[in-house]
């Protein structure tokens, strides 16, 4: 599953530019498997958060507030070693790895948006990677929590 922000990458990779600014589910079987690692709707919410970041927020992927928040979290090493659901339905937190949110500010925003938006039950893990829910996000990365409050509420 992927959000396609622009036509140029699609053209370069032999895909139809008509897919630009859309979320594409490449393979339903893969989506069905991947969704087990998130809470209800989490994987789709992740991709829709990319679309919101690109299309709605000021300066899109170059949004200064998100970039600054991401840079601060990376400098502090907040996401260098976090729990991840790596076993699907059982949702066991037995693995610790560098978070996918470390990839770039786009993944940081999408990953944390899932934790923030998916639900407010502090006993449910909505995200694949730590922080798993809004309550955990508030204590794990309070700066990001405040930013997401401004963006989403």
Where are these regions (language model features)?
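Acidic/His-rich structured neighborhood in mature extracellular/periplasmic domains
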Residues: 1-75
